[in-house]
Amino acid sequence: RVYDNIRKSIQFLLSSNLAEVLTILVATLLGFTILEPVHLLWINLITDCFPALALGMERGEPEIMRRRPRDPKDGIFAGGMGFDVAWQGLMVTAVTLLAYFSGLLLTCPVQMDWAALVHITDPLAHKTGMTMAFFTLSMAEIFHSFNMRSRRASLFSMGQNGYLWGAMVLSLVLSTVVLYVPALAAAFDFVPLSGTAYGASMALALAVIPVVELVKAVQRAVHR
């Protein structure tokens, strides 16, 4: 159980940090700013910290006593964990980038081509996109922590982890406060999101759950 929980926390943190690195890398290569250093600091201190600790409190999985003894030579990435970290990081990167461009499209009054979107000059549109990217990334990582309760079993077959629910509520409240309290929003260079933009960000973030559930189902079928 202890070793399992350590691996879950490591996989969560690595996939989350990979998503942040890839998001910044793609934005830099395309020539725009999607997140500022203070945003990443907030995500690493607030969004990632509490769920990682909560995963360490996870109960043992039901089939844990039916597993074969673990090979002492196996590394921390054994059993396909490295692959899972990679594709899950790419998944969170994709929803974050989609959130940014959704913010631009929701704000700009006219149709814009790809070049105009990448090199946006409207300050309000850029701030809206950046705010949506931040909120989507924050919540996607929170929801992804629920995926990490088991590497193969469905989230919906697991019992409750009150610590993880508490971490989610705390992160949701704090991340929302940053968007809507004027002094904090100004410090983070955010703009208040409309109901549509807030809902779109939440929907994009939630998408990580069905995607991971689908992949887990395929993995269970392959290894049956």
Which residues are covered by each model-predicted region?
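Membrane-embedded transport module
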Residues: 1-152
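C-terminal transmembrane module of polytopic membrane proteins
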Residues: 56, 135-224
